[in-house]
Amino acid sequence: MSLTVKSLTSEWWPALEGLFGRAGASNGCWCMYWRIGPRYRDRPRADNRDDLRQLAASDQPPGLLAFDGDLAVGWCELAPRADLAWLGHSRFLGPVDDLPVWSLPCFYVRRTYRGRGVTDALIEAAVPAAAAGGAPALEAYPVDTAVPGHTTNLFPGVAAVFARHGFGVVARRKPDRPVMRLSPLARWRRPGLRQPSVLSGRRGPGRSRSGRRRRSRLPPPRRARAR
């Protein structure tokens, strides 16, 4: 499987709609939860959809889409933490310090593609994308599935996946919900790159050309072109 990752702009909005379906990924959320909190449940689903569509048309795309050919197979929200107001309301995921980090709070992968490296590809693309936006660090708020009784809501991703991409725990206010961070991001920054980089040829987590398992690590800076 060869994946490409693109920033969500108006050009790719129909692909996102196809991925999210009528449910808007989950319960009509349309990835609005970390922006407006539980209020997303009380609004018409179309309002949540339209808000995300407006963000896709803005100068700051709200996230990344992973494609297998022309089919959108995965999504992650990627934004400056300051744009995700509801993170500040969480007792467990509130700011660790005053650093103007970017955040990777939520993922959605097409059911038939789960466990096939889509999340890995999205994380790999998010790192240079955040760096291009000027982020000093990138944060995530995954579930630590090694903790007994952990939440079964895995939309934030899994801690072990972030760990193999170089993220480290910077706070743990709830056993199964660490705050993880990758920093500094300066070595991934590319002058003039405004949009997330495009990754291609992704074969799934930790696989070489021969298909053998290899040790997964955060890739070095690579040449990327804006989309």
Give the ranges of each region predicted by the language model.
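Conserved N-terminal entry element of GNAT/NAT acetyltransferase domains
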Residues: 1-36, 196, 207, 212-215, ...
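Active-site rim helix/loop that mediates acceptor-substrate recognition in acyltransferases
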Residues: 30-63
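Conserved acyl-donor/pantetheine-binding loop and adjacent beta-alpha core of acyl/acetyltransferases
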Residues: 58, 67, 71-110, 114, ...
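Short, well-ordered beta-strand micro-motif
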Residues: 65-67, 77, 179-183
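Conserved acetyl-CoA-binding loop-helix of GNAT-fold acetyltransferases
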Residues: 106-109, 115-132
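Conserved GNAT acetyl-CoA-binding A-motif
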Residues: 123, 130-152
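C-terminal "cap" of GNAT-fold acetyltransferases
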Residues: 153-160, 165, 170-227
